[in-house]
């Protein structure tokens, strides 16, 4: 469940979600939250026994970052490690939309033993290169990929075929997390059609 504040975290805990992804500015696709919020989120999720994943994304827009932006992301990851965060989610691409392996290695090294989820930057990678990208990520310790199966402007109903193909092509050990447009009303249908047990969304459970 993706949230942007403490109220969202508590609501997710009360609803019994397995994992919480903390962001800032969900309306922009999620950006890095402030560290004070993260520290409080660590306390809440640790007490509840729920994994906390924190977004590492310095700005909205594309995922082709400058050297200065990468340095910011590196420092962010190190700070999150010091705060006791369980995992982080990020993604870096080249100007042509392929995986930026050099920068990814730097960020993965900074993450150390934290879980790393490759976020929806995956959907900007050309379809013909996504399979090799999954292989590379798994070889470098990334075991979860968040994907909508296409542009977020498309309904998830129109990207189901590609999601099925992505899941079928995923190497053993890689978990594909369908997201973007998944909510408590359609989650069961989507999970059944894709034969997955994990989904991602801001409204993945019905809040009371």
Placement of each model-derived feature along the sequence:
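Glycine-rich phosphate-binding active-site loops on the catalytic face of alpha/beta enzymes
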Residues: 17-31, 79-96, 140-155, 182, ...
